[in-house]
Amino acid sequence: MDITIGQKATRSITLTADHVKTFAELTGDYNPLHFDKEFTEKTRFKELVVQGGLTSGLLNALVAMDMPGPGTVFMSQNYKYPAPVFIGDTITAEA
């Protein structure tokens, strides 16, 4: 797929407890920050936090399916998570 100047792509998702559970089942990330409300209430987050890998996965989908699209392979990635994502939040990936 050719990319043109000014071309854009976006993907959004509202993250649910089911998404967090499925991601944990696939990866083994059962950190109590994602599942234990009593635990999170004692942290700076105060609410259940979505796994970082789940949020960054939306960017993977955007690149692999939308821009540039099928056949794309990541050779390197770096992520910074400036704020937590909570269950019920809607996130958007843009390229």
Predicted segment positions?
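Hot-dog-fold acyl-thioester-processing enzymes
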Residues: 1-73
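Hydrophobic beta-sheet segments that form the core/acyl-binding groove
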Residues: 75-95
